[in-house]
Amino acid sequence: MAGEITPSGSRRSWLSSGAASLARSLRDGDDPFRRSAAASRRDAGDDEENLRWAALEKLPTYDRMRRGILRKAVDGGGDGEGAGSLFKADEVDIANLDPREGRELMERVFKAVEDDNERFLRRFRDRLDQVGIELPKIEVRYQHLDIEADVHVGKRALPTLLNATINTLEGLVSLFISSNKRKLKILNDVNGIIKPSRMTLLLGPPSSGKSTLMRALTGKPDKNLKVSGEITYCGHTFKEFYPERTSAYVSQHDLHNPEMTVRETLDFSRRCLGSGARYDMLSELTRRERNAGIKPDPEIDALMKATVVEGKQNNIVTDLVLKALGLDICADTIVGGAMIRGISGGQKKRVTTGEMLTGPATALFMDEISTGLDSSSTFQIVKYIRQVTHVMNATVMMSLLQPPPETYALFDDIVLIAEGYIVYHGPRENILEFFESAGFRCPERKGVADFLQEVTSRKDQQQYWFLEQDHYRYVSVEEFAQNFKKFHVGQKLQKELQVPYDKSKTHPAALTTKKYGLSSLESLKAVMSREWLLMKRNSFLFIFKAFQLFVLGFITMTLFLRTKMPHEKFSDTSKYVGALTASLITIMFNGFGELQLTIDKLPIFYKQRDFLFFPAWTYGLANIILKVPLSLMESSLWIVLTYYVVGFAPAAGRFFKQFLAYFWTHQMALALFRLLGAILRSMVVANTFGMFVLLLIFLFGGFLVSRKDIKPWWIWGYWTSPMMYSNNALSVNEFLASRWAIPNNDSSISAPTIGKAFLQSKGYFTGEWGYWLSIGAMIGFMIVFNILYLCALTFLRPIGSASTVVSDDDTKSELEAESNQEQMSEVINGTNGTENRRSQRGMVLPFQPLSLSFNHMNYYVDMPAEMKAQGFTESRLQLLSDISGAFRPGVLTALVGVSGAGKTTLMDVLAGRKTSGTIEGDIKLSGYPKKQETFARISGYCEQTDIHSPNLTVYESIVYSAWLRLSSEVDKNTRKVFVEEVMSLVELDVLRDALVGLPGVSGLSTEQRKRLTIAVELVANPSIIFMDEPTSGLDARAAAIVMRTVRNTVNTGRTVVCTIHQPSIDIFESFDELLLLKRGGRVIYAGQLGLHSQILVEYFEAIPGVPKITEGYNPATWMLEVSSSLAEARLDIDFAEVYANSALYRSNQELIKQLSVPPPGFQDLSFPTKYSQNFLNQCVANTWKQFQSYWKDPPYNAMRYVMTLLYGLVFGTVFWRRGKNIESVNDLNNLLGATYAAVFFLGAANLLTLLPVVSVERTVFYREKAAGMYSPLSYAFAQGFVEFCYSAVQGVLYTILIYSMIGYEWKADKFFYFLFFMIAAFAYFTLFSMMLVACTASEMLAAVLVSFVLSSWNNFAGFIIPRPLIPVWWRWFYWANPVSWTIYGVIASQFADSDRVVTVPGQSTTMVVKDFLEKNMGFKHDFLGYVVLAHFGYVIIFFFLFGYGIKCLNFQKR
């Protein structure tokens, strides 16, 4: 060996190590000869390592690739310093390396290179270069690329019920004539080359086509777009390789399983994506090294081998990526989601990046990866990717919204895109030269990236014109693009594009021709392990379902108790049929929950499917297989509870045959609802259509209508209903038992026994063969449904696309923009012109300037289970530690810190938005203790997550906020003017009619949504404004617009504090003061910034060891770098302690002390009312909002009416004219069944469909409630009232259809009774749905509860078992069941006064209809008044429970 191996794995000369050893010996008084014995042992260790390496090289290639040598520390003898410096070489199985050992290996290698990623990568590269192995390179070209879309424009693009109807009709007409949609050009004849080993920065304003270009270059453009032109990788078109595996697209949308930890998420992506050609490259490397007699560094060798191990659940690549992206501190924290607390937004963005970096792709297209990151973190990540690009020959195109100068300088090439044109594509060094040739220059202390994004804007361009001798004129984007073609960089690019790429130079490993990273079997194993993990994390849900089934089983077994179940005559069969049907419906409804589970996981599945993580069928098959044990458990639970207690046929064989029937029924139900979820893909549509399918298979299942009574045109429905076969299997198994072999005395049925007589009367199979035929049919249905489910997963795309409304008149927009150009210039330049004064006029509504001081704030949460598992013994985790500060009127304060420092947490604590945890400390509002009720009235909070009602337009959202949050003293006209001015300030006036939509699915882009969030708070005219990441997700120009708005707000005397991640120099220096936090929620600076941040810089430069800031460097970035945890470790100081012992801290404490005393003459804030508007105005405003929202929600309301029409037509044709032909009790039973199904299934569809609608609005409600906008009861009233209006229309439509088609008697009282009961039923179903969402933590839990409730209501509706036959101990449930009252009301109003005579099966006598109903069903016509009152009662009860849940329960955890 050439040198000693230190604990870090680095080498040093024997001479230096010997000298150091001798010096220590003399210093410590040790015996130098004893030290030489230790040195001898080190020599022996080196010899052992060499022997092991020689043995390793003799192994076959496969075994050699799986073995490596690791050094492990051993006792070096003695008790001095050198005792710990000896190592033993151990041969290890790399393929089965323990995760802990893998992390230790990585830490040693990283420590050896002193955390310098580039040196670490160089060691990889040097090893390859040493034996002449060339890394693959990819050159991406795009030529004459055009992308366009067909769009509606103006208000015609809004998805109102009217427009949705017109679109449907237009779609049908367009099959014959051309559509009137307009062509929207997204990319316009763009050309360029993305070169390997060069970092390319893609810049451009929002909606310029950046994401579209990136998706097109990775072979994943939106299928609705028309793409023309040519895209090649190394001269090869997409048909010659798999672009999804060759390149990686990092989306700007963060889609992850919220229940998985960060490490698990990256481990899964690494496992699926595989190592590509790295294994073959490493095999060739080891072969060449062996032939050349080269011995590599054992630790580097082991690390490289560990990175190419495939199919394992844990991989060292994950640890490398975690460390490179700074995610190692949260590696074992769950990712989290909307309702589950997890990692921060910035960390989530890094997980999205890391997910793609774990794979083998060397062409990376990264879309806005810095959103939510601080500038220091962004710089570190981009620097790492730059090192990968330069050292490993990667090809990278990255778009960033606000790259600071130091990050911008890391890139080699710049692509500037605007309005679909490429304005510049070439070296970074030449781009300013290009714009100067056009007359525009970047000012000093202005970031170049910010300049580039503003100089193409009509409103911002003039300020950069520097040719004073020439009069300025607007230079359009198209003109810039033409000028670039004449510029020397553009001409060079054209020449390069004219020379085709030489395909023969393509590295064999550059382009991937293998579709997936793993074999099909390995993919299945990977997906199954992930799905099993998710099932365990959601174990509460499955336990709850089992408990729910247990309760339903208990109800069923006591409802049909064997002591009340005789089996001696034909009429006794009805109760057994009721028990079987109740069981069957319970099993079917139990499978309904699969619909929600399937749809919830689809977005993540689609992302991973499209990136070729795994074949779609492996995901589907994993879900199918993992639900088999669930079916076994639930079927076993049900039959054990019910079989013998109910008193079914006692033979053991029949017990197991019934179990088999339930098992395959459950499997069939799961397969059916999985299929519906995969096909329909929207929860609203799936719930509606799912209930319709359930209705069809139930309607034709042989219980509601027997086979002989089904109309000829519907008989196919009978034979294709899976439930018919389930019914047959259960009935044949029961009624062919020996105890039913009693002779049949009914001459009208030619069957020897009452068991067979019953089967024959229902049209069921009458032999034992019927059971096995039915089981076979159910298995067949299950297989067909599962195959179709796999096909749906494979071929269907996600529904919805991100889009906004295009202006109806582009020319008009341009003229308006031109007229505003001069005015905006004045605002930008901060002049005192009339426009600037006008822009602030809306901000001078009366308000009270207020200060906010806080002292010694601490915040704790319960210790997460993941951290407890790692050995943390504390019961609480401290997120904020002893934070003190003050925010004052007219002072703009920046709250800055690295990701996870606690910025949002502090803001939530101060704003009173925390719903969990323990808060300690003192908060004063202008000297008085803060009261949250009052504080909500005078403060605004712009949340980091932009939460808005998706079905409102931009204008409607802002008007609604102003309506409820401005004082009632502000008249309507003033309010309207104020709204217009706020919209103009944040430049939303051109988007006034744009639909807000759902993030990443439809509607506004990220930056448009951010501006809407700010506008919604600004129209409240608050005294104190909190803004959480107001510029996150915005480009430099939009961020400047927002900050100008904020500055204007501060200048009116308001108190404003903003958290901010990656401010540019000009944005950072627009702040007056800074509160800087470090990880752990501790303050390291609180004070003024000063001119050009001079005060801040002087403070840090005065700390010993802190490097001076270089000229032109961004102070925000410098500040974060010099105060980072790495800097603290290097300087061996704690910046929080430095601050706590500083004069600055003491002066801040003095300021807090001053602000803790009320100013002279200032009274504590109080308002005569809790809310700005009275209750009536709140109700009016909320009702207006809900009407607007419902009108623009066709997936819910249009589908509701379409399904009502379908339900009505199905019932009408199945029970055609039954109301006119009542001759026997069977006819009456058929009508009873029709009424029961008509009420129950459409009502249940309403209930289920409304769940996601109310759930989305509840998230918005939580924000509005925290803002103190209105009383929760006014919200409850508005949503209930609007839903009732739509339900009433639905009830009228439904009543007219089925009343006329079934043939009920046309009498006014009977018709209006029917109409009332239908409208009331729909009302209580929808109100119950709203109540469930308000009273449960998640939509998923609500959906699970629905199946329990519907099963219970079904059992006690009075149809499966009539009220007189219900055991006395359960009759209260019948009266508590709203569905039973509706069936009572409909049947009693239609027939309980009828004197018709009907025949009774099995008896020779006849009965009058009203007597039969009273004796057998318990229905009396005289009782109708009470039935009407009961419906009013249920509507009122469910409404008040909904109001209670909304008012008193809060399931949002913050």
Swiss-Prot record:
<feature type="transmembrane region" description="Helical">
    <location>
        <begin position="684"/>
        <end position="704"/>
    </location>
</feature>
<keyword id="KW-0812">Transmembrane</keyword>
<feature type="glycosylation site" description="N-linked (GlcNAc...) asparagine">
    <location>
        <position position="832"/>
    </location>
</feature>
<dbReference type="InterPro" id="IPR027417">
    <property type="entry name" value="P-loop_NTPase"/>
</dbReference>
<feature type="transmembrane region" description="Helical">
    <location>
        <begin position="1284"/>
        <end position="1304"/>
    </location>
</feature>
<feature type="transmembrane region" description="Helical">
    <location>
        <begin position="577"/>
        <end position="597"/>
    </location>
</feature>
<dbReference type="GO" id="GO:0016887">
    <property type="term" value="F:ATP hydrolysis activity"/>
</dbReference>
<dbReference type="Pfam" id="PF00005">
    <property type="entry name" value="ABC_tran"/>
</dbReference>
<dbReference type="GO" id="GO:0046686">
    <property type="term" value="P:response to cadmium ion"/>
</dbReference>
<feature type="transmembrane region" description="Helical">
    <location>
        <begin position="1372"/>
        <end position="1392"/>
    </location>
</feature>
<feature type="glycosylation site" description="N-linked (GlcNAc...) asparagine">
    <location>
        <position position="745"/>
    </location>
</feature>
<dbReference type="GO" id="GO:0005524">
    <property type="term" value="F:ATP binding"/>
</dbReference>
<dbReference type="InterPro" id="IPR034003">
    <property type="entry name" value="ABCG_PDR_2"/>
</dbReference>
<keyword id="KW-1278">Translocase</keyword>
<feature type="glycosylation site" description="N-linked (GlcNAc...) asparagine">
    <location>
        <position position="829"/>
    </location>
</feature>
<dbReference type="GO" id="GO:0042742">
    <property type="term" value="P:defense response to bacterium"/>
</dbReference>
<feature type="transmembrane region" description="Helical">
    <location>
        <begin position="637"/>
        <end position="656"/>
    </location>
</feature>
<feature type="domain" description="ABC transporter 1">
    <location>
        <begin position="170"/>
        <end position="444"/>
    </location>
</feature>
<dbReference type="Pfam" id="PF01061">
    <property type="entry name" value="ABC2_membrane"/>
</dbReference>
<dbReference type="InterPro" id="IPR003593">
    <property type="entry name" value="AAA+_ATPase"/>
</dbReference>
<dbReference type="GO" id="GO:0005886">
    <property type="term" value="C:plasma membrane"/>
</dbReference>
<dbReference type="GO" id="GO:0015691">
    <property type="term" value="P:cadmium ion transport"/>
</dbReference>
<dbReference type="GO" id="GO:0009617">
    <property type="term" value="P:response to bacterium"/>
</dbReference>
<feature type="transmembrane region" description="Helical">
    <location>
        <begin position="1236"/>
        <end position="1256"/>
    </location>
</feature>
<keyword id="KW-0472">Membrane</keyword>
<dbReference type="Pfam" id="PF14510">
    <property type="entry name" value="ABC_trans_N"/>
</dbReference>
<feature type="transmembrane region" description="Helical">
    <location>
        <begin position="1196"/>
        <end position="1216"/>
    </location>
</feature>
<keyword id="KW-0067">ATP-binding</keyword>
<feature type="domain" description="ABC transmembrane type-2 1">
    <location>
        <begin position="524"/>
        <end position="735"/>
    </location>
</feature>
<feature type="region of interest" description="Disordered">
    <location>
        <begin position="804"/>
        <end position="823"/>
    </location>
</feature>
<keyword id="KW-0325">Glycoprotein</keyword>
<feature type="domain" description="ABC transmembrane type-2 2">
    <location>
        <begin position="1178"/>
        <end position="1391"/>
    </location>
</feature>
<dbReference type="Pfam" id="PF19055">
    <property type="entry name" value="ABC2_membrane_7"/>
</dbReference>
<dbReference type="InterPro" id="IPR034001">
    <property type="entry name" value="ABCG_PDR_1"/>
</dbReference>
<protein>
    <recommendedName>
        <fullName>ABC transporter G family member 43</fullName>
        <ecNumber>7.2.2.-</ecNumber>
    </recommendedName>
</protein>
<dbReference type="InterPro" id="IPR013581">
    <property type="entry name" value="PDR_assoc"/>
</dbReference>
<dbReference type="GO" id="GO:0015434">
    <property type="term" value="F:ABC-type cadmium transporter activity"/>
</dbReference>
<dbReference type="InterPro" id="IPR029481">
    <property type="entry name" value="ABC_trans_N"/>
</dbReference>
<comment type="similarity">
    <text>Belongs to the ABC transporter superfamily. ABCG family. PDR (TC 3.A.1.205) subfamily.</text>
</comment>
<feature type="binding site">
    <location>
        <begin position="897"/>
        <end position="904"/>
    </location>
    <ligand>
        <name>ATP 2</name>
    </ligand>
</feature>
<comment type="function">
    <text>ABC transporter modulating cadmium (Cd) import, thus controlling Cd(2+) accumulation to prevent phytotoxicity. Confers high tolerance to Cd in yeast. Prevents leaf bacteria proliferation, such as Xanthomonas oryzae pv. oryzicola (Xoc) RS105 and X.oryzae pv. oryzae (Xoo) PXO99, by triggering Cd accumulation, which in turn impairs bacterial virulence factors.</text>
</comment>
<feature type="glycosylation site" description="N-linked (GlcNAc...) asparagine">
    <location>
        <position position="393"/>
    </location>
</feature>
